[in-house]
């Protein structure tokens, strides 16, 4: 990629960085159901989500912001419908994935996720009781499964406790009285550039870009197989191409890369 031809860059001369959001964050990525489905299928290792497709996902983030406030605006909440092996919908199972976007370690993330869960379950209860009065008081009433996931872009190893109970005093002595769950961390750095390149899906290129935090990272990114980057970018829908450009531009600006050089780097993946 370092020797990308001038012709490729000229083809992409119409790209104007100032037209794009410079502070793109991960929510832009996970608002896209195609990228989200690839992430859930290929990077979480959760059997229940192994066959999730874009059409099985509904973004319900805005529904809960009225309850949770502006501090949660960067997070996404998805409702996922589970299908049978033959592709038919078995039923509308409410599997809500909470994907946090942390560039550094948040040691209180388990408690933050619990707040999400309580709001989601409370809203679900209210909705079901409107449909059928008193339904939540019945023995067979069940609340929806919530799968909490942290998408971590930072360089440091994630060292926060993965269980809610570990944030509460007397967690061992009084364990049976303490609510608990485990959240999953998917770190972009748990994969090498080679491993991501081999996955060859659109989310893998997102994660390759998200790994760029230093000039050394940028240099390593530009060594990634040009064939992989070109084919992944070239076959991506236009809305995903725009996401690539936005997140890459945002990262290059954080590295204080000059505008002209940043445009050329984007041209290396965007010259189609």
Q: Where on the chain are the PLM-derived regions?
A:
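Elongated, amphipathic alpha-helical interaction scaffolds
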Residues: 1-272
